[in-house]
Amino acid sequence: RDLNLNAGGEYWLWFPHNLAVAPGYNYHWHDNTKRYELYRLDELAGWGEDGDHPLGMLPSEVELLQQTLDALNSYWSYLTDYSHRGSLYAKWEGKPRTSGEGTWWYVEARLPLMYVWQTLDYQRERLDTTVSRRHVMFEPSFRVYGRWHNFQRGIDIRYNKSVSFPSMTSFIDIRSTDDPLNIRLSNTGLKNSHQHNISVYYYLNSNRKQRYFNTYWSYSITQDAVAQGYVYDKATGVRTYRPENVNGNYNIGGNVNYSMPLDKARRLTLNSALWSRLYNSVDL
């Protein structure tokens, strides 16, 4: 079962010189119930690899439920979380006196502050526990966009930050052995991940000469990203996985585009494009 509820609103305030401010509020509620039951047919006498039953046949439901439940790897969970999100949005627009001429600027900023509360009831074999966590997150975003020289030149700069937090089951001491060759552990020390993104777009055009140039570049970096590390046991062939926070994940790249006519009659046009991107991934 999965339920969600959202409610919120904004109120716009208009000021002189094309300035607008909009304070806002949003409430989110989430409720999730999950039951995972693992049954081991090989635990029944006569139903294993050396059994006499043909492939595809199943035992009765009573036998199945009473004797084959893998309590160690079966669980029930009930997750409830809610968030209060207050935000302040502001924008300013510097319009030219004549449409399509002069200089035009647009600036906007969104400053949201969010409080998140989560609680998880979890049952697994002999484990019966409740875990609660609280998060305060600030996820700002900014944009500066300008055009000048009769709108034939311009630049667009953007930045935003996002925060993500680990699953609540990560903060419960769990050892999952449902796949005997790939054992999975939790990590109660995981931190929230923070991602920063910035991009720049610039163009330089000449409508009279039909020459067009533009370039776009972006950079993204993640702090405390979650990676799955593992230890391999050569004697048994078993891998034991455990999530960890890592730093150093980023990517940077962009493209450059240019076009121009090759002859005076402008029957032939040269189009060129160059793009590149570098990914740096840190693992365990």
Question: What is the role of each PLM region?
Answer:
Residues 1-284:
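Exposed, low-structure sequence patches enriched in small/polar residues
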